[in-house]
Amino acid sequence: MTDPSVDEALARRAAQGDQYAFGQLVQRHGRALAQAARSFGVPESDVDDIVQDTFIAAWHALDDFDSDKLFRPWLFRIGLNKMRDLRRFRQVRHFLFGAKDIEDAELTSDVPGPEREVSARLELAKIMQVLNRLDLASREIIILTSFVGMSHPEAAMALGTSAKAVESRVARARAKLTALLQSSQV
């Protein structure tokens, strides 16, 4: 977890044109954004583009950033919007042209590793399959709170809702996920 006060200080400096400060924000949050994108089912070939597009949009919107609020949820809200945009684009393309991407058939890993790592990857792949069966709202809340590690107030800011609503959504999403996992024998 990153220190919010450091993020806000870096964001203020970046808003004044300090590229080094912005680079520090990229280093501090790039990996978590990439993991969130993967968790949302963004194909590996698009993950770096989503992260880059998110940071470009954040750079351009820094003047609108309210330094009284937390930077991380603000950034992840931009990232979620970029992921939704990609999903909509793919849905429209599939509807219009019937195009499916080769990335949809990617393997988790084609490099053999220790048995433990392979087993962990298989388990994660099963969980991700079940997670992808959840509705988008449930998937978003599980990924932000469980995978990214956001608190309920942070997730609320990222999703544009209240912390109480996040608490309810987390409970419902976990119940759905548990039911799917049990029915799938994962």
UniProtKB/Swiss-Prot annotation:
Name this polypeptide is given: RNA polymerase sigma factor NccH
Entry-linked PANTHER family: RNA POLYMERASE ECF-TYPE SIGMA FACTO, RNA POLYMERASE SIGMA FACTOR HI_1459-RELATED
Superkingdom: Bacteria
GO biological process terms, semicolon-separated: DNA-templated transcription initiation; response to cadmium ion
Physiological role: Sigma factors are initiation factors that promote the attachment of RNA polymerase to specific initiation sites and are then released. This sigma factor regulates the genes for a membrane-located efflux system that confers resistance to nickel, cobalt and cadmium.
Protein encoded by which gene: nccH
Motif segment (Polymerase core binding): 49-62
Residues within the DNA-binding region(s): 152-171
Gene3D superfamilies the UniProt entry points to: 1.10.1740.10, Winged helix-like DNA-binding domain superfamily/Winged helix DNA-binding domain
Protein species of origin: Alcaligenes xylosoxydans xylosoxydans
InterPro entries: RNA_pol_sigma-70-like, RNA_pol_sigma-70_dom, RNA_pol_sigma70_ECF_CS, RNA_pol_sigma70_r2, RNA_pol_sigma70_r4_t2, RNA_pol_sigma_r2, RNA_pol_sigma_r3/r4-like, WH-like_DNA-bd_sf
Parts of the chain that traverse the membrane: none
The organism's taxonomic lineage, starting at the top: Bacteria, Pseudomonadati, Pseudomonadota, Betaproteobacteria, Burkholderiales
Transcription regulation is among the record's keywords: yes
GO molecular function: DNA binding; sigma factor activity
Family: Belongs to the sigma-70 factor family. ECF subfamily.
Keyword annotations from UniProtKB, A to Z: Cadmium, Cadmium resistance, Cobalt, DNA-binding, Nickel, Plasmid, Sigma factor, Transcription, Transcription regulation
